[in-house]
Amino acid sequence: MNTNEELKDITPVNYWIGKENKISAQHLQNGERIVIVGFGQSMTPILKSGQPVLVEPVTEETKLSKGDVVFTKVNGHYYLHKIISIRNDKSYQIGNNHGHINGWVSRSTIYGKMVKKL
């Protein structure tokens, strides 16, 4: 499938890592796939600063695994970071790609999962 065709129904949303971004979370909670552009070095080399990624909503059926890059809210801040550890399939430890741990979250605060780098 052509990338333009893949993205024709996508909501574009830019976001700064660590800043409040209720709009992105709301789009994902409404079942919309979104494009997020994160900025900063916390996820290099997995993601480069300014690199757009396609994020799909997390539903009850979504499989979440260690290493997945997710859009989540931790301690009042939104991040596009990865799952570091999983406890009992209910709690997820979120951190960046350089060893910094943001904290533990429940599945209900993981709004989206990165499915493709653009």
Say what each PLM segment does.
Residues 1-118:
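Extended hydrophobic leader/signal-anchor segments used for secretion and membrane insertion
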